[in-house]
Every structure is written in structure tokens, then in C-alpha cells.
From Swiss-Prot:
MF term (GO), any: structural constituent of ribosome
Organism in which the protein naturally occurs: Prochlorococcus marinus subsp. pastoris (strain CCMP1986 / NIES-2087 / MED4)
Gene3D superfamilies on file: 2.30.30.790
Family: Belongs to the bacterial ribosomal protein bL19 family.
HAMAP family for the chain: Ribosomal_bL19
GO cellular component: cytosolic large ribosomal subunit
Stored InterPro entries: Ribosomal_bL19, Ribosomal_bL19_CS, Ribosomal_bL19_sf, Translation_prot_SH3-like_sf
One protein family per Pfam: Ribosomal_L19
GO biological process: translation
Protein name listed in UniProt: Large ribosomal subunit protein bL19
Keyword Ribosomal protein tagged: yes
Gene name linked to the record: rplS
Database matches in PANTHER family: LARGE RIBOSOMAL SUBUNIT PROTEIN BL19M (PTHR15680:SF9), RIBOSOMAL PROTEIN L19 (PTHR15680)
Amino acid sequence: MIIEHKMAKEKQETELEITNETDTTTELTVEKQGKELIAQTNLSSSNLIKEFEREQLKKQLPEIYVGDTVKVGVKITEGNKERVQPYEGVVIAKRHGGLHQTITVRRIFQGIGVERVFMLHSPQVASLKVERRGKVRRAKLFYLRDRVGKATRVKQRFDR
């Protein structure tokens, strides 16, 4: 399978050839601006995907555990204005890892429980700050959904 992609854009010409001799190896050739820059690597398609995802990861994320109270700054676009809206609550679940890592944050708003799922590496998440550490003995805190008032509080942890 041979894929050739040629693109010319403002004095920049890029030629990309990917030759797949077997299912697991690929050859990558790149030429830029008259200089020949050739990079040949033998990467499987899954390794190419992992490399792309590694570039998309955010570098500065705090350690977040289930039970922690966090403040998430969410980018909101209203018309042509963009602002950051804080959302504070208890982390009741963590899922996956890598680029698709998510947390579920629960808070009480006007007497009603509201849960939001945030992708940690999404560009919509502007900031993430741990307000206090929680001491829990479960991986998922879905039982907090059934509790009301002071029963929804999580004990504070001081050793992390």
C-alpha cells in the first residue's frame, strides 16, 4: 500500500510517502523547503497513534484522586467572547488513562446534584486545581448520589 501526499503552501513544499511493506512496518520520508530532510523509521500504525497522542497530552496536571475536591476552569465561548468558568466539586470517578483520561465531578447546585465529566487533556479545560484531599476507601463514589446534606461530605486527608 503506497500513499503519496503532496502539498505546496507559501514556499513550503512537503512530500510525504508512507510505504507499507508488511502490516507492521512503515517508511516515512519528508522533504521541506528545498532542503532534503529524510526521516526513515520503522513504526507500526499503533506506535504512530501513540506518538501522536503523546504530543497532545498536557504536561502540567496535578495528581488527582477520587474523593478530592477540585476546581476546574472550563472555557466557555459566548458569541465572540471567551471566558473561563470555575466548576468546583468532589471527584467521584476516574476513568481511562492517557489522552482519554476523564474525571466525574459532582456538586450540589440549588439543592440539586449536578455531575459533569471532564476530559483532562481537552483544550476546553483551562485549569485544574485540587482544593482539598479526600480520604475514601472506594474507587468510585457513586453512593454519594443517594446521600443528602452533611452525609455527602468526604473526610479530609492530610498525608498527600
